[in-house]
Amino acid sequence: MVKTTGTICDLVTTSFQKSLLEDCFDNLKDKNNRLRFNNFAYSIRELSRHFLDTLAPERDVVLCLWFLDESGKGMVTRRQKIKYAITGGLSDNEIDDLIGLETLSKVTKEVLDSIDLLNKFTHINQSTYNISDSEIDKNSTLVIKAFENFANRIIECRESIIEKLESKISREIVEKAMWEISDKIDILATHHNIEEINIRNYNVLCISSNKILIKVLGELEVRLQWGSDKDLSYGDGCELYEDFPFSSVLSFTINEDWEKTKIMVEDYKVDTDKWYK
């Protein structure tokens, strides 16, 4: 009997998907049901649908500038969902620059082929109905591999785009954005100045229909001042230099010209815990 594999279990993310996957394999255990393989194949096919819906909600796909209502009814096609799951709202020009449109087309075809294979096994006919245990093992393995290929090709291609996108968004752009929002920081003292912003690393969190979220980690070099400048001149004030780690989430509006893209602050936290130790 085929059992759940580590790979397919690692691919599903939500509690619903995990429960559905468990029930998919429970179908195969019911030897009194002559439709047990068909039910298994159908359930895995539905799991692939939910997996894709999680990565590409229709409400987000329709907001992309590249979205076209091919059905005339506002319906999102499977091909469009796959594109969004991989590229978000990036334009075709941007995609071509990052990985090439031919690569996207090839991956999309591979994903669609995997879905077609899953669909094939959901049809009830003599070759799939009430089949032997050995046939169930063989066909179930094909179904599992089809799902794994479907999910992995989407994930791998998306990761490739993110990696190239991180290279394209320069450290200078991120650092400039952090300086522009540095006046939002309120740290400990009566007065303070940000002397230096050191970006340790940054990575793309997600690509949505109209923006890219980037997590930034680093340290702030800060001059802390208690009292006025006049107090300091009389020796009544105090100033110290400290560095504090920070984390921030920046939102880059999707734009082919990264030098002109609009940058917003989604989140900004400065860790001052060491000050109190």
Question: Where are these predicted regions, by residue range?
Answer:
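Short, hydrophobic, well-ordered secondary-structure elements
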Residues: 25, 36-59
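Charged alpha-helical initiation segments
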Residues: 1-38
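Charge-enriched, short contiguous segments at helix-coil
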Residues: 103-154
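Cystatin/cathelin-like cysteine-protease inhibitor module
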Residues: 142-277
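Short, mixed-charge amphipathic alpha-helical segments
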Residues: 87-114, 202-207
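Short, solvent-exposed secondary-structure capping/transition elements
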Residues: 52-64, 127-132, 152-160, 227-231
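Alpha-helical interaction scaffolds
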Residues: 70-97
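Amphipathic, well-ordered alpha-helical segments in soluble domains
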Residues: 16-23, 43, 50, 110, ...
